[in-house]
Design a protein with these regions (language model features):
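N-terminal flexible/basic segments that precede or flank functional cores
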Residues: 1-21
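Short alpha-helical DNA-recognition segment
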Residues: 30-48
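Generic structural marker for isolated residues within well-ordered, non-membrane alpha-helices
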Residues: 22, 33, 63
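DNA major-groove recognition helix of helix-turn-helix
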Residues: 51
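DNA major-groove recognition helix of helix-turn-helix/homeodomain DNA-binding modules
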Residues: 60-76
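Short, solvent-exposed alpha-helical "recognition" segments
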Residues: 54-60
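The alpha-helix within a helix-turn-helix
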Residues: 26, 37, 67
């Protein structure tokens, strides 16, 4: 089971926190998925994956880049 490995568990928690921070920002800023995709320099399908919680499709690297391009501090988002 993935959650049995502390490293896997931490990566999952980190991804989840980053995704939630990105979703919260998109909602609070009133951005469409297309507008958010443009800001984050990703395809709209990637934004859709985040908004639908498809955590398995996302890497920490990608989520950190997306958060940073929205002006979020991934380290604070992850706290």
């Amino acid at each position: 089971d993935m959650a049995d490995d502390p490293a896997d568990a931490m990566q999952l928690r980190l991804k989840s926190k980053l995704m939630n921070a990105i979703i919260d920002h998109i909602e609070q800023a009133g951005l469409t998925q297309s507008a958010a995709a443009e800001l984050m320099q990703v395809q709209r399908t990637r934004v859709n994956d985040v908004c639908n919680g498809r955590i398995d499709k996302m890497t920490i690297d990608a989520l950190v880049a997306m958060a940073a391009r929205l002006g979020l501090d991934p380290l604070q988002s992850a706290a």
